[in-house]
Structure formats: structure tokens, C-alpha cells
């Protein structure tokens, strides 16, 4: 099972398609590979809960039953929006990627300027992960940042034990200035020397 919902939100120029490398590029025709795709990310249809699967034809009957008994079908207006999105993919995706690339280029350098904060420049997606020295409990830190700095970040532990100690910052903002304001709030909070 390969979750490739962020495939189109890729910022490196090392593929001919501009998309992230796919497991489909490596799979043999008889592999039991199922690739999950979504309209939520690259088409900004978050919350509409519409996507698609790429899978061997032999799996279609069983997966069809699973879908029928769990979700039934997507509303017609959502399906029509998806048709337009697919028809306009060459116009939509580059604009979305350019905007997210700009937001990432705003957020990541500002975070790197904060003492005690480490982050990396994500090659894709719409999130930056950061670590704050001296704050190993990501849930406790996320709660404190909401209460004390007015800054809502996701705790790394929500994404599995490997992400404990990290925070996830969504940089999919309409206004990159809001990202700068968020970093200012984090910087002010850190400068106040708030102990854990």
C-alpha cells in the first residue's frame, strides 16, 4: 500500500514529470501494489474526501465491496469538481506548487534563525517538521504553544513514535505573512525562557 497523496506537491526538479517518484515506477505488473491518491492536497479539496486507487484489476471486486459498505459514494458536486480538477491539472498544479514553494521558502529560513530550533526543508508536501531543544514531549509542547503563544502546531507523536519530539507546521497558508507572524510568536515564546 503506497500513500501518494502528496505526489504532485514536489519541489525538487529531479523527475521528468515534476511529480515525486512513485512506487508504480518500480512495480512489476503482477505486484499486489495499491496506490492511494487524493484530491485533498494538490487540488486543495481538503475535507471533500474524494480520491482514487491504482491497483491490480483482480482486486477491484473486493475493494468495490469495501467502498460500497463504508462510504457508498461521493456527492455529485464533489465528483464534478474532481472532473474539472483533472481536466485542468496542468493549470492548477503548477500554481499550487509555486505558492507552497514560496510559503516553504518563507517559513523554513525563519525557523532556522531561531536559537534552539532545528528543521529541514521538506522536498514535498505542505508541512515542515521542527524540533525545539529541551522539549522532548511534543504533545505537551504543542499544548503550551497554543495556550501561551497562540500558535497551533501538530505534535509529532500524533504521527507515530518516530516523530516524538518534533512538531509539524503546515505552511499551506494563503498569506506567507501569517507564517512570519507565527515564527515571531514562537521566537517571542522561546525568548521568554519558558521552562518545560
Where are the predicted features?
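PLP-dependent class I/II
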Residues: 1-196
Amino acid at each position: 500500500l503506497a500513500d501518494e497523496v502528496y505526489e504532485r506537491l514536489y519541489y525538487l526538479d529531479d523527475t521528468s514529470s515534476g511529480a515525486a517518484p512513485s512506487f508504480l515506477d518500480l512495480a512489476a505488473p503482477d505486484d499486489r501494489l495499491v496506490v492511494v491518491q487524493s484530491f485533498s492536497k494538490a487540488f486543495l479539496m481538503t475535507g471533500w474526501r474524494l480520491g482514487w486507487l491504482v491497483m491490480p484489476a483482480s482486486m477491484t471486486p473486493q475493494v468495490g465491496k469495501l467502498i460500497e459498505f463504508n462510504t457508498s459514494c461521493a456527492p455529485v458536486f464533489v465528483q464534478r469538481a474532481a472532473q474539472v480538477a483533472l481536466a485542468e491539472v496542468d493549470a492548477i498544479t503548477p500554481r499550487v506548487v509555486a505558492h507552497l514553494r514560496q510559503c516553504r521558502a518563507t517559513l523554513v529560513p525563519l525557523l532556522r534563525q531561531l536559537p534552539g530550533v532545528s528543521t529541514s526543508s521538506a522536498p514535498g508536501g505542505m508541512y515542515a517538521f521542527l524540533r525545539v531543544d529541551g522539549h522532548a514531549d511534543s504533545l505537551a509542547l504543542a499544548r503550551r504553544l497554543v495556550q501561551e503563544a497562540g500558535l497551533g502546531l501538530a505534535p509529532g507523536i500524533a504521527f507515530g513514535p518516530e516523530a516524538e519530539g518534533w512538531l509539524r507546521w503546515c505552511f499551506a497558508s494563503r498569506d506567507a505573512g501569517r507564517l512570519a507572524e507565527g515564527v515571531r510568536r514562537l521566537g517571542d515564546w522561546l525568548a521568554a525562557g519558558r521552562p518545560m
